[in-house]
């Protein structure tokens, strides 16, 4: 361990200090354990002695071991301790900064970023701003004010300008952000990160043609930068002009022959243009690229599935790993189930959970969705209870179990799981909406249900499923006019059989039977086997449409 520690040869040399016998024994035991490969024991001893002695040399060695072990919690504690003992230590400042960022304390982190800026490293100012996007509005505004105050004494520092522009963008102050990005271009015209930021802001502020032209030029000038290529592909696709995207990507792919990000974009453009053979040819080449092969196999699987070649689709989905593992596995499991091989699908998912423990919660969720789709509700509930034994408190698994319980009519279990989610995350819009909808559907606690749904809607004001829930609870309360307004809005945002079932029912109840039939008829054309619409028709005795 001591020879291989990544920081072992770069740290500051500290003079040997006399230690009490107990400390010396603990440190010697730690070094011996490290040589035997018992890194956890070595780290525990060094962290404990770093706390006890506060000695910078002990802290530095503890940091080396924590880095070797990849123990972020220990690194965070040691970084803060190091800064307390040696305020001018750059490595300690870096560790403290990223610890505070992980803890969601960006203004405290900015103190250390300022120190690093004064010592020649402004990069953390960019990273800090990039991680501020999810902050509450008041804390985000305070951080932006801090950046602006710092900029007064560093008016042309590119890292500070970049971070400030990001914060302004996040705050919706697009013109101010654009002005700073233009200043960055003047100071560093050939820096890819500046070009990317500036063109994205041009696009956001409506100068879409100018943004696309400048980003295309940047891609030509920096063929080695995949980030620019990926951004160019996204910007092209946002235009929703597939023919134009193909033309541009074919041109650039001929110039930047080694840029596989462009080729991947071209493959997707071919797919969207209903040119599967061209898409397949590109993707088969990209399947040889270590960075893109997983995504390539996933999309090859989709092409094969669309062509009805189930065997080939399954082969490709099996090869999709990394970030593509879960979506590919979900498709593969569905294909097996459609062939009547549900048991084989479940065995495959069980094997993957052993091989990819870090992905096990998602794999449990895929299996539960499969069981619910096949109407094995009790099995799904049992599986999710098992999964929560291995991953207690997992929000996605709790939510999935609530769905299974709802299918079984176990509303008490639904409420328990959704409230367990809200105990962890009171602003979880999905849980708020699901609980409100469940109460509206299966109880008379309508006011409580509406309050929960309105909280969800405040968090996601344009979510059609939440708007549908609000319409439904208003209907259950007898507020038919208000319910119709919300359900019509939901239907305009989302084509969905549940929304159609609800809208049709309210129309039917208010006497507009012809409009209700038209809504149901249109929905059944797209979803001919939807059980909710059929159950609604039967319950209302709506007769043949």
Q: Which stretches of residues belong to each language-model region?
A:
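Alpha-solenoid helical repeat scaffolds
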Residues: 14-35, 44-545
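Eukaryotic N-terminal, low-complexity and coiled-coil-prone scaffolding/targeting segments
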Residues: 1-13
